């Protein structure tokens, strides 16, 4: 199985609370410390007092937070919650030829400006171009992955820009990185954000590729993240 990412020197801690959107308090070696959380979602199923957390020592000494949050435990698995790794993980999937829509394309540029947004990837083949936006999905209920777990105006705007790009000759894709081994289906979370859900379905019907791909995270002396499989999309209202 292909390992997409290796993270060295992980530390274990215990979650206490979330003072603000991007900061959590944790116990490390019995002491209360602050850690930076790069996932802006609500993460209610993961941010439970006493839950195990994987951390990495911050590289800069000029921060208020000593650590970066890497992963949190959900039942018997680890869930990556650091969006700083999404671009490299997505690149490994794009370059692996595991997804039909990406075959024949190479990564031309990361962080490509389009309209009012910055899209994660511009891909190119001999005669065609594709814009790819990457979203991390951590909410998995039974075998169903749901995105988003909090309303996302930015996410809706990205999807609308991708749909508009079709009329300018681009191919467009949304790659959802689903952090959960048990997920077998993906659905936009209509209950949480009906505007995003509707925008994604409209974009898909217009020709935007919706590609959910599961990844697993194993932790021992290192953090190993590896892609598993593409899963099916189940649109709101469809029968299981």
From Swiss-Prot:
InterPro entries cross-referenced by the UniProt entry? SfsA (IPR005224), SfsA_C (IPR040452), SfsA_N (IPR041465)
Query: Protein name, please?
Result: Sugar fermentation stimulation protein homolog
Coiled-coil ranges from the UniProt annotation: none
List all membrane-crossing ranges.
none
Note the superkingdom of the native organism: Archaea
PANTHER family linked: SUGAR FERMENTATION STIMULATION PROTEIN A
A single Gene Ontology molecular function, please?
Answer: DNA binding
Q: Which Pfam families match?
A: SfsA (PF03749), SfsA_N (PF17746)
HAMAP family, per database record = SfsA (MF_00095)
The Swiss-Prot or TrEMBL record describes its family as follows: Belongs to the SfsA family.
């Amino acid at each position: 199985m292909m390992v997409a990412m290796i993270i060295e020197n992980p530390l274990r801690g215990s979650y206490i609370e979330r003072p603000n959107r991007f900061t959590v308090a944790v116990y490390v070696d019995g002491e209360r410390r602050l850690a930076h959380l790069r996932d802006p979602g609500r993460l209610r199923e993961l941010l439970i007092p006493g839950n195990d957390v994987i951390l990495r020592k911050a590289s800069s000494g000029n921060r208020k937070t000593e650590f970066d949050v890497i992963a949190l435990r959900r039942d018997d698995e680890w869930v990556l919650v650091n969006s700083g790794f999404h671009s490299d993980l997505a690149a490994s999937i794009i370059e692996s030829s595991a997804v039909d829509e990406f075959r024949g394309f190479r990564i031309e540029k990361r962080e490509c400006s389009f309209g009012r947004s910055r899209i994660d990837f511009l891909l190119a083949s001999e005669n065609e171009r594709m814009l790819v936006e990457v979203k991390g999905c951590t909410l998995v209920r039974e075998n169903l992955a749901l995105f988003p777990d909090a309303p996302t105006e930015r996410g809706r705007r990205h999807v609308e820009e991708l749909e508009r790009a079709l009329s300018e000759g681009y191919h467009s894709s949304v790659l959802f990185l689903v952090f959960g081994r048990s997920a077998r289906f993906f659905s936009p979370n209509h209950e949480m954000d009906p505007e995003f859900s509707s925008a994604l379905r409209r974009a898909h019907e217009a020709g935007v590729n919706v590609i959910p791909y599961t990844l697993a995270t194993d932790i021992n002396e290192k953090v190993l993240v590896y892609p598993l499989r593409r899963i099916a999309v189940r649109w709101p209202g469809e029968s299981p």
